[in-house]
Amino acid sequence: MSTQNGMYYSLLEWFKTLNLNAPHANAEELADGVALAQALNQFAPESFTNSWLSKIKSSAVGGNWRLRMSNLKKVVEGVYEYYSDVLNYTLQHDFVKPDVQAIAEKCDLSELERLLQLVLGCAVNCAKKQSYICEIMCLEEELQANIMRALQELESSTRQTTEGGVVSSLSRNSLSGMLDGNAKALEERDAMAQKCFETEKKMLLLIDEKTNLQQELHKLQLEFARLEHNTIGDDGVSLGPIQAGSVRYNELRRQLELVKEELLQSEGAREDLKIKAQQQETDLLHMQQRIDELMKSTAELTALKDEVDVLRESTDKLKVCEAQLETYKKKLEEYNDLKKHVKMLEERSADYVQQNAQFEEDAKRYANTKGQVELFKKEIQDLHAQLDNESSKNVKLEFDNKNLESKTLALQREKDNLLKERDNLREAFDELKCGQLSTNSGSLTGTTMSRELQPPAMMDKMQRLEAENKALREGQGGQTALAQLLDDANKRCEHLREQLKTANERILSLSHASQSDDPILKENEFSKQIKQLMELNEQKTLQIEESATQNSTMQCKITQLESTLATREQELMAYEVKYRKCIERAKEVIKNIDPRIASVMEANNLEKSVDVIEEESKTKMSGMEEQLMASAFYRLGVNAQRDAVDSKLALLMGSGQTFLARQRQSAPRKPLTTMKSK
């Protein structure tokens, strides 16, 4: 096993311990991605579902590297989604993403090592992590060290968003302690095995010695029997009979004693060896019992260490749960406040809905009055036209009145002048009758009489004109003076033309008055007409003043309504801000209720539903605001128009009309009662 690929082979040995249907003994069998997908489905079936597993093509085992690459892409994407969505881990840039093309084409061991490292991270963070950790602990020490190093590299290259690390269940302290305890137990086991081996060797040696001693004893017995029955020595000399006191007997007796001593020594050695063998057997039994006890103690120690780790995790979880419980209590209080606030908002929204319904009913009712309003508009337009005609007539009558007054004054003056001229003519006629004059004098008197018959104003004008003509003839040298004189002359000509027009009008009026029989009645009629015109003028001025006051009141009402609308809009904005805050708090409460059990998909669904509710509430509130503003503006316009129509009708029903005209006019209606806004 090379040092460069030691981690890969360690991960492969761990992967071989998994119970999978697909072959997974070497890199070529892992390069198709089927075994990896089955392992992920075994680790987290809720994330790597059967439908996802069905997308992995098992036919990619052949030589089609493109199908294998597509399978590996699906596996890598699924692993990255599992890390980001379920475990809330983000892999940093120092951890290079496995190159699926290199794995599919060349079975690159380094890339496959990174992929197996990611799969190992999924295994130690799934729901069944305790069983997989126990399987890792049952491997060899070197494999465990390499797997631990792979997990540490994965932890250093990941950045977690929630509490805990990548290898939450295998903390460094607990795992190092477990490894130390396991190493000590293995050393004790090796020492006991060495002792057992040595005792077995000693037993074999003692058994061999025992067999050798038995063989020697058998030989000695045979030799003793031979020597006992043999009468000839080794050198061929006859030993003689064996009798007491004989040399042979003594020699045999001496040999027998020597043999007995040797036998006693061998028996003592045998007994010692037996005792030693029994002691060694008892020691071996004790050692085996001690080994069994140590094995049990190691198993119990591992179980106790697992329990200690579980208890530590449970204590950590308990502390976290206590902190979360305190936060949940605070959030529950806030949630109750939010519930109360939401109830108030719902009540207000219900009130707004009722107001909107009432406004809609009012709008339906007012739709029936649209025709009448249009008729009133037409009548108002006709009345305005009549008012314009009457105002023009009033102006004409005022002008005629002034003309008549000037005419009456001129007529009185002319009447006085005519009376004076009549008296003068009578005197002149009397003088002509009395005196006798010559024709020249008569002609002169005729010319003088014709001049006297002319009015004095005309004479003054003629004289003034003659003087101006003389001045003009004399001052022809200066053009500026001539221009000024021409302008003055033109102005005077225009003034004279106007005077001629007025004179002609007076002549026509005098002729009409002379034709009439009773001028006093006509003067009375003229005075009555003038009085009526003055009254109409006063009424029109009153109407204008009242319309001005109504306009000012309407402007005040409009400003008040605009201010109320602004305040309502500010209130609605404040309510929207509070509503958003409430929704955000509710989101946080929902997220923090059980973040370990609640999946990310449920949180996303909740956020989407909350966003949909916010959009619906915004659209409803905006629609209600538009409807309320439209109905309020429509009602304001209708009331203002009705007040204007009623005021004009009331003015038209004044003293300037007859009884029948008053009966023909429609009575003003009562103003509509506006609804009070809550």
Swiss-Prot record:
Task: List, for all copies, the residue spans of the domain called Calponin-homology (CH).
Answer: 5-123
Q: What is its main location?
A: cytoplasm
Q: How does it assemble?
A: Homodimer. Interacts with microtubules via its N-terminus.
Annotated compartments: Cytoplasm, Cytoskeleton; Endosome; Synapse
Instruction: One GO cellular component term, please give it.
Output: microtubule
Q: Where is this region: Interaction with microtubules?
A: 1-155
Write the record's keywords in alphabetical order, separated by commas: Coiled coil, Cytoplasm, Cytoskeleton, Developmental protein, Endocytosis, Endosome, Microtubule, Synapse
This one is known as Protein hook
Pfam annotation, one family: HOOK_N
In which family does this protein belong, per the annotation? Answer: Belongs to the hook family.
Q: Which GO terms describe its biological process?
A: cytoplasmic microtubule organization; cytoskeleton-dependent intracellular transport; endocytosis
| Role played | Involved in endocytic trafficking by stabilizing organelles of the endocytic pathway. Probably acts as a cytoskeletal linker protein required to tether endosome vesicles to the cytoskeleton. Involved in modulation of endocytosis at stages required for down-regulation of membrane proteins that control synapse size. Not involved in synaptic vesicle recycling. Required in R7 cells for boss endocytosis into multivesicular bodies (MVBs). Has a role in regulating adult longevity.
Q: Return the PROSITE patterns for the record.
A: CH (PS50021)
Against InterPro entries, the record matches this protein to: CH_dom, CH_dom_sf, Hook_C, HOOK_N
